[in-house]
Design a protein with these regions (language model features):
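Extracytoplasmic
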Residues: 43, 90-92, 132
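Mature extracytoplasmic domains of secretory-pathway proteins
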Residues: 56-123, 127
């Protein structure tokens, strides 16, 4: 009898875990990127699939294209540009990154010359949040895309005047 109780309890727990895992999977729209062009030579296609969220109009996505580099105390960034392009006939957009991965840096003196690993990026950009379509990027093979979700802090506040 004790064995049956343990077996039933285990079954209920496993079913609950399975259902919660399914719910997590169902929070994403079906990924469809076949209509996007193939990456050109020396580039790769990467994408961000955003989960379904409440009030998506309130959210933004800030994305960073860059690479881990060993840097000193100077401010560094990667030279290049990000152009938003459209998939012909579909009305979908993607981001094409044009960069050779070269860095520009300030020229401050760094007395200890201690280098640390840091994610060095092109100028970050912000786009609207849309869980129905992936954010597709074409980037040089030696770069990567990282992102964060920007959420409103609170209700709107009024500006003051003199």
């Amino acid at each position: 009898m004790k064995f049956i109780k343990i077996a039933l309890t285990s079954l209920v727990i496993m079913t609950g875990v399975s259902l919660s895992a399914q719910k997590k999977i169902e929070k994403f729209e079906k990924l469809e990127i076949e209509m996007f062009p193939k990456a050109k030579e020396g580039y790769k296609q990467v994408y961000i699939q955003l989960p379904i969220a409440k009030n998506e109009n309130d959210l933004k996505v800030e994305y960073f294209v860059g690479a881990d580099r060993m840097v000193d105390c100077n401010q560094q960034s990667i030279m290049g540009s990000i152009k938003k392009k459209d998939v012909e006939g579909w009305g979908y957009s993607y981001f094409d990154v044009d960069s050779k991965g070269e860095s520009m840096t300030t020229l401050m003196g760094c007395p200890d010359q201690k280098k640390t690993k840091k994610f060095v990026t092109l100028q970050p950009e912000i786009t609207r949040y849309n869980s129905r379509l992936p954010l597709v990027f074409y980037i040089p093979k030696d770069l990567e895309v990282r992102y964060r979700i920007l959420k409103p802090e609170s209700d709107l506040k009024k500006a003051t005047h003199k």
